[in-house]
Swiss-Prot record:
The record's account of how the chain is modified after translation: Contains 3 disulfide bonds.
An MF annotation (GO) of this entry: toxin activity
Residue numbers covered by the propeptide annotation in the UniProt entry: 20-41
UniProt note on tissues of expression: Expressed by the venom gland.
Function recorded in the entry: Inhibits voltage-gated potassium channels.
Protein name: Kappa-scoloptoxin(07)-Ssm2f
Species the sequence originates in: Scolopendra mutilans (Chinese red-headed centipede)
GO-annotated cellular components: extracellular region
Length: 74
């Protein structure tokens, strides 16, 4: 009888605890938010004009300026 209860406990415990944590996938919006946050962090680390991003014939201004959208070459 004790063996029966032990097996029953193990099956119920594994189905409720392990099944609740392993079987449920992570929702896709969480991944999307994480990717967007990484993109924002990349832009925040490099806010200034970079000479290598400027097209041919254009250069960054002498005074360092923060580029919000695209390269700020003049």
């Amino acid at each position: 009888m004790l063996v029966f209860y032990a097996i029953l406990f193990v099956t119920v415990f594994s189905n409720t605890v392990m099944g609740a944590t392993i079987d449920k996938p992570i929702p896709k919006p969480i991944f999307r938010e994480a990717i967007e946050e990484m993109e924002v962090n990349k832009r925040a680390k490099n806010p200034y004009c970079k000479e290598e991003k400027c097209p041919v014939g254009k250069h960054c201004p002498k005074k360092p300026i923060v580029c919000r959208i695209g390269p700020c070459c003049v």
